[in-house]
Amino acid sequence: MDSREENAVYDDMNLYIAPQSFIIEPNGGDELLVIGRHDKVTRVQPASGGLVANLRPTRRICGVLGTIHLLSCDYLLVATHRLFVGVLNGAVVWRLAGYDIIPYIPNSFQRKENENYLRLLRQTLDTKFFYFSYRYDLTNSLQRQREVAQSRPEVSGLLQRAEQRFVWNGYVLRQFNCDKMEKFQLPLVLGFVSINQVQINGQTFFWSIITRRSVQRAGTRLFCRGSDEQGHVANFVETEQIVEFNGQLTGFVQTRGSMPFHWHQLPNLRYKPRPVLVPGKDHLAACGLHFKEQIRLYGNNVAVNLVDHKGAEGELEATYARLVREMGNPQVRYESFDFHSECRKMRWDRLNILIDRLAHEQDQFGVYHVFDDGKLVSTQTGVFRTNCIDCLDRTNVVQSMLARRSLTAVLQKLGVLHVGQKVEHASDIFESIFKGVWADNADLVSLQYSGTCALKTDFTRTGKRTKSGAMQDGKNSLMRYYLNNFADGQRQDSIDLFLGKYLVNDNEGGAVPSPLESKHGWRFFTFPSVLLVAVAMFMITMTYPAEFNTENLLFMLFWGAMIAVSATGILHYGVEFVQWPRLFPPISFRDP
């Protein structure tokens, strides 16, 4: 039997909600998953016992996502709807399109506080970029899948073989576990998947992109920067480019992640808060731990840093360069490229300077290449780890160029391209697909981290920078400003709750204060109120009849001064007007 069939997860089930238990029955299966609603004991038992003979299914589900404890009770999470994405190496890939949150024992205990937690839980599950497959391990690259199969052949089940860094419902799946439950546990990957059947030179092949976001140090743009004490970095993302052709598979992996030392850039109502190093932290230790893990996972690392060489970003760049030098690890090479300076005035052709610098190592690293029968041709021996300040816009541009160069080499080796032919010149149709997919990848990764689509995607989609693209970037930048200052605190709480970083205390709202309770000082209400009144009075004064010019002028000067004073106060105490995470607040306030 195909090992993927042995590890497959049930894809079509009936859910029965009985007074004492949840019963999940796979259609066509010979076993049941029984979850006690009172004792929370989980077991898998034969379907022949007649347990559901007299029951009517409550609903049909397409996946068991896990269970989570909130204030009033535990909740069962199930997938109810899915969207077809494509077929990858013979296995169907889906996107989560609907879910249900079902209480074990409904009650009204701490109802208000519990509803707040349910709202946070839904906010993460409502993300439209969760992907899954019942037979294909989306969490592992092709190369890791082979390594896992060889090093742990006795392990069965998609979740058990999965790369836990990329299992977004790993915490809620681990909350209930029992023997023989593997076929009921459906891992979710957050990121982006695109599967395309394409043709070049009359040869048909599948070209796919899989992007996986890490659960380690997961969060939002300005609340999650740099590294933690274990060397886990913010916005760490692995992207794999897969080619399937004529019984052969190739995979090319790249990574991105925040600069691996302790720094932050907390919102304060300024358009661009200054990023700063966190004082008193061991930056070298964090950087060393990070690259030790990256080398273990990927082999040699080329750290491609695209931040500015001047200003606040320049200070971070100098720190990163110094730390890599002090590490003295021959398996890590640092490559710095001031993206904005080099490509100013829309000279994006200068990116080829960077690609040329990386070409030798890219040829050395190679790609993973294997035949369907398991015959190994080559492995990828190193990785490009790219970053800019956000690891979004500039990073995606460079990654797409490295992916294109790798794809040219792969297709030449497979015989799809002629010797010396480049993929960007081989087919206008494929080039349009390639650019569109990488631009979509940029947008989705950016939406998950910053809340808006990526910047600079006009270059990725068209191959050149345009004025309309620059205008769209301006709109997205303004939207990022609003979300990062006034919405991302709750989004960060939602992520921390779903990933199990925060565990709900049953006494919250009673003996223990609820962390979700709003706490604001007097300035939070006073300055905006004064500003609102001052603006209103200023506008009213402007409508007065012209014969009262002197009096009008005095009124306008007074209310104009009040506008200036209140606006200055808001900016000066900007951190007090930001929506901060409440489960793990990065700072605290003390009103005088």
Swiss-Prot record:
This is Phosphatidylinositol-3-phosphatase SAC1. It is found in: Endoplasmic reticulum membrane; Golgi apparatus membrane. The keyword Coiled coil does not apply. Residues 545-552 are lumenal. The chain crosses the membrane at residues 524-544, 553-573. InterPro entries: SAC_dom. It comes from the Eukaryota. The gene is Sac1. Residues 1-523, 574-592 are cytoplasmic. GO terms for biological process: axo-dendritic transport; axon midline choice point recognition; cytoplasmic microtubule organization; dorsal closure, amnioserosa morphology change; lumen formation, open tracheal system; negative regulation of JNK cascade; negative regulation of smoothened signaling pathway; phosphatidylinositol dephosphorylation.
